[in-house]
Regions:
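Conserved beta-strand/loop scaffold segments within soluble protein domains that form the structured core
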Residues: 1-170
Length: 170
């Protein structure tokens, strides 16, 4: 998003696979100085009834420029047989704000590494997530918030509801 531009409508990105498919999508979101946007990324398995298989190895990179605001929403809704590996990184500059919300609903196994680097003075990050699992699903999350500049603020809140023999590893 160019400097000074405010996008009123959300930008929607969908990564979908058929049964047995592979996805290696890479999402790059860059907001220039004083820009504002909302981005929704979604993953899904198509043409199945919840038991499709596949493999996803994807990345998300976010750069929030000086005085910019990004509202980022990730919805992971793979079928129960998909293996999901993701690397997510955000860099937040001076007086910029990131509101990042994640929902983990599907997959057989999810391995997610999420880093937020607050590199500018007064940079701010609010990271929220929710997980709902069942059966033998296993979700593994590793989150880091790096306060690299003075007067930065980050807030991290994840909640999970697990059923059956599913597991969540932090």
């Amino acid at each position: 998003v160019p400097p000074g531009v405010r996008i009123a409508e959300p930008i929607h990105c969908l990564a979908a696979i058929d049964d047995g498919g592979v996805d290696t999508s890479h999402v790059l979101v860059v907001l220039g100085e004083d820009a504002e946007a909302t981005v929704l990324t979604e993953t899904a398995t198509c043409g199945t009834t919840g038991s499709g298989t596949g493999f996803h190895c994807g990345g998300t990179e976010i750069v929030v420029g000086k005085n910019a605001l990004l509202r980022m929403v990730n919805v992971q809704n793979w079928d129960r047989g998909v293996w999901h590996v993701a690397r997510q990184k955000a860099v937040i500059h001076e007086n910029a704000k990131l509101q990042w919300t994640l929902a983990a609903l599907g997959s057989r196994l999810s391995q997610v590494a999420q880093d937020v680097a607050l590199v500018g003075k007064n940079a701010e990050a609010q990271v929220n997530g929710v997980m709902f699992t069942e059966g033998k699903q296993q979700l593994v999350y590793n989150t880091l918030q790096h306060h690299e500049a003075p007067s930065c603020r980050s807030d991290l809140l994840y909640k999970g509801a697990l059923q059956d023999r599913s597991r969540l590893v932090w």
